[in-house]
């Protein structure tokens, strides 16, 4: 994810200061940001296609209500989150919106995999902080996650921040956020 501005960071304890460069590009993982994006999109659509203004506004109103319900449902589902470590440092928007307790990441830059020393530190962190789950992503080989989890009392799960395994369609975004919620909840 070099094109995302990811930089190598050795310490992931402070999740208020993610190492995404100046901006974290994973804005879609907070549904409130999705509402802002939708409002902007509709504004531009209306500017360029004013004859369909009422349709755009009607669709926007429905989408905003659906997002509000999504946020409420996910907050209720994740009301007792356990601690986890994620594959890469991409989830701060989701973490902050839904109070998810992510204690670290295997890598900040997905082009640079962690070495033996960093993996040992992660195993130590898992034991010390009583991390209950570590997550891989479908876009990347889970061997590192499985190697760390081997011989440890820890669950593994999959987070898909891109929705790579979802079918395209009008429910895609909602499925993406719900699936992330289910992954955190189930792990």
Which role does the model predict for each range below?
Residues 1-187:
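Extracytoplasmic metal-acquisition and chelation regions
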């Amino acid at each position: 994810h070099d094109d995302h501005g990811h930089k190598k960071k050795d310490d992931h304890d402070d999740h208020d200061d993610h190492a995404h460069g100046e901006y974290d590009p994973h804005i879609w993982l907070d549904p409130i940001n999705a509402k802002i994006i939708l409002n902007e999109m509709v504004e531009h659509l209306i500017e360029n296609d004013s004859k369909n203004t009422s349709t755009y506004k009607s669709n926007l109103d429905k989408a905003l209500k659906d997002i509000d319900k999504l946020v409420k449902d996910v907050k209720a589902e994740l009301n007792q989150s356990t601690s986890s470590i994620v594959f890469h440092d991409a989830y701060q928007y989701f973490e902050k919106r839904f109070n998810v307790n992510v204690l670290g990441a295997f890598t900040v830059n997905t082009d640079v995999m962690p070495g033996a020393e960093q993996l040992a530190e992660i195993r130590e962190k898992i034991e010390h902080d009583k991390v209950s789950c570590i997550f891989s992503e479908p876009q990347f080989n889970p061997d590192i996650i499985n190697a760390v989890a081997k011989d440890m009392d820890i669950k593994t799960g999959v987070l898909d921040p891109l929705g790579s395994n979802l079918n395209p369609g009008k429910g895609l975004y909602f499925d993406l956020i719900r699936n992330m919620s289910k992954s955190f909840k189930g792990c």
